[in-house]
């Protein structure tokens, strides 16, 4: 059994209705902590009821309530729809309209699940907030550090890079040292009906995967057609709206050419999609903005060799980073990398420790 090493405490558990957070609630309850379950209603979940493998749908709220009832712990459902729309959905839509590839789960963790939920937990008199994320919090010489989960297949550190130092002190991640299989065994041991519940696979507010319909609903007439231009300067055809394209995309371009073409750049100002050969996707360096830094401060002229991830599914790559003012950094790969997409996160690691990260800008070369 994993023990948090804390004395008996009042702990709020963010309960999504899935097996991970349910196992956390059961684990902490068995250890004698005063556990309070909170489930956030984040969007109009009616469209997601009955959808398999979606997150935060009506069924999930019901499952969280059933787990809380079985454990005999208080459980609250909080309506965060307006906060979620403002902080996550609107940002998601606007990012696509700017020709970016957004990452709504990071925005949700940053603003709603951590910032707002920690505030609520404190108001309830809780000492800590626990979640079912597969990451580890390790107490270092200079305070709490964020580390990868021990199970590489389930590590979620990429999605939590915007967690602040203050938030990290308050948070607990009991599953960071477990595999998914071990978590399911724990849930079975506690007799939880969600022990075999499938993992969520989709963006929670787009359970059918059709993000374009969400964008068009919130921002009508957002699929304005425009030019497709080869990186060498000649026009190849017409696109159906920049929201339909992302960096590195090959399929669905609707262009006949003598070699495979990929989306290399998206220009939202002039409504142009640039395409080129695979070699045109190669990137040596880029700039990140809104940097959240969890380690010792980097000096202005200092260059630091690190590992970076530019997509959650890609392995870390060696790079050199340097500061550019208070909230920007330059990232330079030691070897070129393909398809660096504006709007995605660049997360910076030293071994298993998350040093920080930021959002990839258009300043790519």
Swiss-Prot record:
Reactions mediated catalytically? S-sulfanyl-L-cysteinyl-[protein] + uridine(34) in tRNA + AH2 + ATP = 2-thiouridine(34) in tRNA + L-cysteinyl-[protein] + A + AMP + diphosphate + H(+)
Per UniProt, subcellular location reads as: Cytoplasm
Q: What CDD domains does this protein map onto?
A: MnmA_TRMU-like (cd01998)
* One GO cellular component, as annotated: cytoplasm
Q: What's a single GO BP term from this record?
A: tRNA wobble position uridine thiolation
* Chief place of localization: cytoplasm
Q: What is its EC number?
A: 2.8.1.13
Q: Is Isomerase among the key words of this record?
A: no
Q: Which residues form the active site?
A: 108 (nucleophile), 204 (cysteine persulfide intermediate)
Its Gene Ontology molecular function terms? Answer: ATP binding; tRNA binding; tRNA-uridine 2-sulfurtransferase activity
Q: Which InterPro entries match?
A: MnmA-like, MnmA-like_C, MnmA-like_central, MnmA-like_central_sf, Rossmann-like_a/b/a_fold
* Residues bound to ATP: 14-21, 40, 132
Q: Which UniProt keywords apply?
A: ATP-binding, Cytoplasm, Disulfide bond, Nucleotide-binding, RNA-binding, Transferase, tRNA processing, tRNA-binding
Record-annotated disulphide pairs: 108-204
Q: Does the keyword tRNA processing apply?
A: yes
- Site annotation (Interaction with tRNA): which residues? 133, 344
SUPFAM superfamilies (alphabetical): Adenine nucleotide alpha hydrolases-like
At the top level, the lineage of the source is Bacteria
Q: Which Pfam families match?
A: tRNA_Me_trans, tRNA_Me_trans_C, tRNA_Me_trans_M
Annotated stretches, region: Interaction with tRNA: 154-156
Q: Which family does it belong to?
A: Belongs to the MnmA/TRMU family.
According to its UniProt entry, the function of this protein is described as:
Catalyzes the 2-thiolation of uridine at the wobble position (U34) of tRNA, leading to the formation of s(2)U34.
The protein's name: tRNA-specific 2-thiouridylase MnmA
